[in-house]
Structure formats: structure tokens, C-alpha cells
């Protein structure tokens, strides 16, 4: 009850998914990115989001829920050289690793939004990450039925290094 007691607002952020959404060290296991290839793990993630919304959705201290942190797409995977930058700590587990498609991430966000909104009031925010492709989201979830959706972007120098300063500045 600290958030309510001290007037704080909390953003719950799922920072990783089973078998990682990005292959980064902060994605759970460096060098592995297989989450989107495993339907049971995708469903697990959606169920966790739903349970969080069910448990905390009506709490005054909850500002919102971020669906997943920094999922990586094919384009960013190539530009960053993820497999060289983040060598696999478990080469056996990393076998078959590949990035998420933008289409998969978009569908996951739509599914997550629907599952969250079953329990999360409209005044609470649903936060989605731009997957390091800020321009790709210009018209996504713009329809009136999507309430209080926030696009999260992380501007890292390593992205400017890999993708060019133009996208970073824009």
C-alpha cells in the first residue's frame, strides 16, 4: 500500500519473457531470443499480464502496465549485430534463436491490450515499446477503441551507432 499511502504511481513493466524477447542480457538470457517461436510461452506471458491487471488494475497507485520491455525485430537485430554483441551464455539453448517479426509484436500488443482491458479500467495506461523502430508505430492502435495507450521509446547510443543518427534524432 506504499504507493497509495505516499501518493506514488506505479508502472508495472514485464522486463523479460520466457526464452527472451531480445537476446540481450536484460532479456533474461544473453544470446537467446526464442519467445515468439513458442506459442505456449507467448500464452504464458499474456496470462501473466492478465493476472497482473486482475490483481492490481483497480489499485489507486497503479498508473499502468507495460506489456514487454524492448522486444527486438529483424531489422534491429541485424543493425545491432545482436549475436556478436551478446554471445550466447548457453549455446544449446540458443540454437534456433531468431528475432521477432514486427507483425508478431503488433499482434502480441493487440492481444495483450484486449486481455488487459478485461480487468484494467480505461483510465489506466497500457504501455507498448517501440521495438527500436519508432516510425513503425505512427498509425498503430490509433482507433478510438484503444484508450490510454502509451508508446515507450528508449533512445540508446548503441541504436544510433547501429541504425544511424537520423532515426535517433527523429
Q: Model features per residue range: what roles?
A:
Residues 1-16, 20, 24-67, 108-115:
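An active-site-proximal structural segment forming one wall of the substrate-binding cleft
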Residues 47, 54-57, 61-64, 68-170:
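Extracellular glycoside hydrolase catalytic/binding regions
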Amino acid at each position: 500500500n506504499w504507493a497509495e499511502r505516499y501518493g506514488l504511481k506505479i508502472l508495472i513493466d514485464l522486463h523479460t519473457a520466457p526464452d527472451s524477447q531480445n537476446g540481450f542480457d536484460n532479456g533474461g538470457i544473453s544470446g537467446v531470443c526464442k519467445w515468439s517461436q513458442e506459442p505456449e510461452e507467448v500464452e504464458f506471458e499474456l496470462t501473466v499480464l492478465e493476472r497482473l491487471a486482475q490483481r492490481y488494475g483497480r489499485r489507486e497507485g497503479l498508473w499502468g502496465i507495460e506489456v514487454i520491455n524492448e522486444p527486438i525485430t529483424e531489422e534491429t537485430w541485424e543493425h545491432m549485430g545482436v549475436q556478436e554483441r551478446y554471445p550466447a551464455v548457453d549455446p544449446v539453448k540458443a540454437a534456433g534463436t531468431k528475432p521477432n517479426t514486427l507483425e508478431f509484436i503488433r499482434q502480441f500488443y493487440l492481444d495483450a491490450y484486449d486481455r488487459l482491458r478485461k480487468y484494467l479500467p480505461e483510465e489506466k495506461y497500457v504501455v507498448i515499446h517501440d521495438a527500436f523502430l519508432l516510425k513503425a508505430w505512427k498509425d498503430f492502435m490509433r482507433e478510438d477503441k484503444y484508450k490510454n495507450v502509451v508508446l515507450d521509446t528508449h533512445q540508446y547510443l548503441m541504436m544510433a551507432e547501429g541504425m544511424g543518427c537520423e532515426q535517433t534524432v527523429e
